[in-house]
C-alpha cells in the first residue's frame, strides 16, 4: 500500500472509487472547479503491474478557503480576523479495504500538507462525525427551525407601499441538469448583484469569503437543485434574495440576503415580506406544507421565519454536520470559533459554500 499525492494517471481509478462509495452526482463537477486539485488529493494506492493499473482504494482531498474569524479585539467595532482553512472533501475508501485505517492515515497526510501550506485550521462537513473526531475534528452547530407553513389566508404584514416585488428567477429549459457556470438561473442576472448583498448581509465567524470562482462555478453547482427568489425595487435593482429547495412536502431555506439596515426598516422588511410570501406560493405550487429554515441567529432571519411558519408546532434544532480542526492556530482559538454559532456574533456557514 502506498500513500501519495494523486497524479493524472490516477484520475480514472479515483473517480471509480467515488462512484462506488457515494451517490453524489455533484462530487466530480465540484472537485473539478479546483485548478490545483490533484496536488491536494491524498490517495492510498494498491500498485498494479503497471502505473496505469494502479488502484486507488482511499482518498482525501482538501482545498484552501478563507473564512471570517473571531472579532478583532484591537480593531474598530465590527472588525474581524480571517483564517485560511483547508476544506476537506471526497473522503472515501473502497468497500473491500475498509477497517484498515486507510482514511485515518490519509487524513493525517492531508493535515501535514495543510500545515506545510500555512493553513490555520481545517473544515469539513459530514454525517458521520465519529470518523473524524479521533483525528482532531470537532463539530459546530448552526440553528435550524422546522414547522408548518402559514396557510394561504394568513394575514400579511401591513406595508406603506408596494414598491418591492418578488421575482422567481426561473431556469432556462435548455440548461443541462447540472449547470457548471453562472448564471444558474436567469441569464440577465449578474452574480455581482447577489455577491454585493451577500457580502454585506452577515459578515460573521465561519462565513466563507467568496471569490469570483465561487460565484461563477461552485454556487451554481451547490444550488443546482434550488430555486432563487429575488426582491426587486421599482428600478429593477435587487434588494434581497432567497434560495430555497423543495423536497417532497418540505421547503428548505438555504440562503438569505437583504439590503442594509435593521430588520424593521421599511425597504428591508418589505423585501423579507415579499420573499417569504413568494416562497410560500412556490411551496403551494409543489405541494409542500412544511419548511426547514437554516439561517443565522439574526433579526432578519427571525422576521422571515415568522412570515413563513405558523407560531405553533415549531421545532428548534441544530445542524451539526460542520467540523473544525486546528492546524497552525491554537485549539483554544478554534474552540472559540466553533462556539460563535450560539453567541451574539452568530457564526454561520452557508450550504452554497460546502466543500
What do the predicted segments below correspond to?
Residues 15-77, 205-228:
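Active-site rim helix/loop that mediates acceptor-substrate recognition in acyltransferases
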Residues 43, 52-65, 85-92, 236-246, ...:
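Conserved beta-strand in the GNAT
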Residues 82-95, 249-266:
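Conserved acetyl-CoA binding element of GNAT-fold acetyltransferases
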Residues 115, 120-133, 293-302:
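Conserved beta-strand-loop-alpha-helix junction that forms the acyl-donor binding cleft
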Residues 136-157, 254-355:
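Active-site/acyl-donor-binding loops of N-acyltransferases
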Residues 138-261:
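Amide-forming acyltransferase catalytic core, primarily the GNAT-like/NAT-type
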